[in-house]
């Protein structure tokens, strides 16, 4: 039977380590062994932080310390963001909003694809969208750190309203950028017992994002991957256990948001039990509502209750939610307005998945899909195929009463409040000096080692195939 490469990777991820043999984490990634901090003595006490109070647990100087358990955490009692609770004054957002025309408010809802490894024509096209259409943000894809920072400075210098920048950073900047840290896939993290390490990873990723001038991480994946034939989620999920997915997802979200970047949980209402890639077609999920509530929606409900700032809506066909033919959840008011915003009481930002994906793009003309996504209740339109045409369609819909100006105003102001929370009311200082060095610090690499150590799991060792009983007498091959 043929198995995809990603399927094999997912199996290898589950086979990462042996309980009780901590040192084998180095075997999982031997290059990381060299990144053990030189000033290891700073780890001789275990420090826990809550609010401003530190609790130090001294360790005997002769006691061997398990580095996978060392962490410094600072949790907030309430993880809700100010722009969600709508209680914190946002003078900058209010001022900018009042300065924009209706068309410019519509343009704030668009986040357009950007690459730092493409030619001058791509850059020229983006400059036109920024200066003429006055789009709200960019989602960066493939490239390298220095080139992306150069482009970021260029685009921010020419925009009327500061751009917010997003990236898919599920396992770190390396998902899109060269010369950056590659943290473990979520399936690997799903094998860990120590969830606090996921918080630390989220916090480090937030630090690296801010160094790059990036504000939104389209992560974590909260899909419960209960279909072994899933071609697109697979190792990107924390696994098939809903509690494990939820708990680790929450730690990832808090690590990001408590360190100043916006998390975006995906792919609502759950892309785990599919056997089709929504980049290529529209997958159907035929479960009843009770099943969706108990499995697929479980991690999202918990994330909403804990204050996740944004959620990405998937391109799925779920007849129990909306039985119109070829109607994706992204374009379904029953899914976004009714289920997500009313029934689950989500007050944050809802992003569409990329609107150029065949799961939606094959059924609508450019511009039409954007309007349908807005009517469904989405706040941010990601990767539109034709921004000028989409803005024209939306403006015509406002004029005809198909969508209200008040709806546009509400969503635009929510985006501007988010930008203010992200610090975009102040000019960012972007400096390429030592950029790659900063993104690959000893501290970051050492956490990567601890994540590898903590994720090692022995599923079965029949007939002592793995020679751990005589580890000094045998050689172990690492694949």
Language model regions located:
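Preference for extracellular/luminal or secreted protein segments
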Residues: 2-6, 10-14, 20-112, 116-128, ...
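Second-shell residues forming the walls of enzyme active-site clefts
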Residues: 101, 138, 148-163, 173-175, ...
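Active-site mouth loops of central-metabolism enzymes
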Residues: 109-120, 186-199, 281-295, 357-364
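Short glycine-enriched loops at secondary-structure junctions
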Residues: 114-118, 165-175, 215-225, 265-271, ...
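Short, acidic/polar
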Residues: 118-131, 198-205, 293-300, 365-370
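Catalytic domains of carbohydrate-active enzymes, especially glycoside hydrolases
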Residues: 125-141, 203-216
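Active-site-adjacent structural elements in enzyme catalytic domains
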Residues: 145-162, 195-213, 406-413, 417
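A substrate-binding/cap region within the structured catalytic cores of diverse enzymes
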Residues: 192-214, 221-249, 253, 257, ...
């Amino acid at each position: 039977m043929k198995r995809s490469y990603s399927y094999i990777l997912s199996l290898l991820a589950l086979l990462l380590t042996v309980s009780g043999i901590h040192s084998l984490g180095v075997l999982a990634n031997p290059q990381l062994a060299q990144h053990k901090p030189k000033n290891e003595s700073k780890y001789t006490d275990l420090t826990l932080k809550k609010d401003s109070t530190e609790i130090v647990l001294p360790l005997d100087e002769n006691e061997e310390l398990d580095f996978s358990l060392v962490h410094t955490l600072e949790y907030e009692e309430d993880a809700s963001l100010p722009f969600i609770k709508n209680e914190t004054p946002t003078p900058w957002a209010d001022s900018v909003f009042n300065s924009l025309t209706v068309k410019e408010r519509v343009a704030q809802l668009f986040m357009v694809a950007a690459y730092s490894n493409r030619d001058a024509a791509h850059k020229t096209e983006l400059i036109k969208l920024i200066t003429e259409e006055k789009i709200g943000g960019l989602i960066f894809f493939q490239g390298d750190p220095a080139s992306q920072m150069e482009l970021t400075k260029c685009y921010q210098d020419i925009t009327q309203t500061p751009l917010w920048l997003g990236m898919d950073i599920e396992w770190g900047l390396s998902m899109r950028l060269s010369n950056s840290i590659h943290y473990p896939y979520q399936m690997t993290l799903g094998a860990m017992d120590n969830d606090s390490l996921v918080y630390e990873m989220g916090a480090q990723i937030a630090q690296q994002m801010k160094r790059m001038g990036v504000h939104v991480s389209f992560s974590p994946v909260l899909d419960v991957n209960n279909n072994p034939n899933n071609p697109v989620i697979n190792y990107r999920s924390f696994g098939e256990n809903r509690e494990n997915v939820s708990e680790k997802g929450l730690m990832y979200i808090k690590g990001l948001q408590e360190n100043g970047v916006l998390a975006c949980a995906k792919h609502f209402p759950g892309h785990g039990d599919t056997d089709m890639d929504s980049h290529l077609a529209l997958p159907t999920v035929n479960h009843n509502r009770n099943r969706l509530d108990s499995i697929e929606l479980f991690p999202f409900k918990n994330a909403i209750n804990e204050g996740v700032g944004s959620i990405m809506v998937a391109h799925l066909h779920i007849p129990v939610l909306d039985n119109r033919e070829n109607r994706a959840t992204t374009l379904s008011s029953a899914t976004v307005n009714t289920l997500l915003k009313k029934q689950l009481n989500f007050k944050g930002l809802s992003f569409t998945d990329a609107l150029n994906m065949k799961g939606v793009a094959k059924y609508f003309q450019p511009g039409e899909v954007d309007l349908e996504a807005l009517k469904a209740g989405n706040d941010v339109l990601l990767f539109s195929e034709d921004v000028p045409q989409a803005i024209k369609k939306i403006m015509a819909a406002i004029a005809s009463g198909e969508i209200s100006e008040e709806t546009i105003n509400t969503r635009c102001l929510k985006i501007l409040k988010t930008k203010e929370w992200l610090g975009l009311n102040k000019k960012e200082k972007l400096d390429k000096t030592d950029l790659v060095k900063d993104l690959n610090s000893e501290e970051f690499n050492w956490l990567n080692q601890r994540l590898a150590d903590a994720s090692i799991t022995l599923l079965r060792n029949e007939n002592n195939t793995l020679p751990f009983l005589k580890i000094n007498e045998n050689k172990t091959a690492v694949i």
